[in-house]
């Protein structure tokens, strides 16, 4: 990221794990066009799940997963976006945030999920006030279908509409005009801190009846470069063809 961005900052912090251990964590903040006061934010989580608790094989449920889709897919798109921003300086300020420890929580316990975004939201500079934020999570599915996430609609309906209008304008049919189930993700702490942020996520990976989420099957062969390109294409249009 340092090869591309105008500035990169590491936000380091610690967390006490469920077994009392101290875990060292790091958020990464990359900024482009530092002089611009009109800014937008894109984010993803760069950690992966330390245990595959949803794996059909009980022997694998205490082992870490690769997280090719759940984690790496959003990061991959943002790394490529950073390269594009380096080659084509944006007309607006852009901040790319890579959050740590999104996936440390246990099922049905939200306390230890989204730790990186919670820390960032609690310690952000008063001057950090992007026009909107877009979170990428699980966007590499070969059967990509991104629906409107209910918490995004609740916190930032105008941003959801803007993104879906842009997707329709450019023929990105993977952005479906229906709602998904609500998701607790890194966009929640950001919205609670006043940063209007929506979550682009395809939780049905690959479908409702068979999910690789939080299992050892979340591997690169289940993901599609085409899906990554579709989401990346949307982001570039939002940056360079602005109307919000």
Language-model features, listed with the residues they occupy:
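Solvent-exposed loop/turn segments at secondary-structure junctions
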Residues: 14-17, 34-36, 46-50, 101-105, ...
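A non-catalytic alpha/beta surface segment that caps or lines the substrate-entry region
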Residues: 1-35
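Glycine/charged-rich beta-loop-alpha catalytic/anionic-binding loops adjacent to active sites
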Residues: 53-64
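Acidic/histidine-rich catalytic neighborhood of metal-dependent amide-processing enzymes
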Residues: 62-158, 174, 182, 186
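Structural recognition of the beta-strand scaffold that forms the well-ordered cores
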Residues: 9, 29-31, 39-43, 67, ...
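Sec-exported extracytoplasmic/periplasmic mature domains
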Residues: 2-6, 80-90, 122-126, 164-169, ...
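Surface-exposed patches in mature extracellular/periplasmic domains of secreted proteins
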Residues: 5-18, 89-94, 174-181
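Active-site-adjacent substrate-binding region
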Residues: 132, 141-244
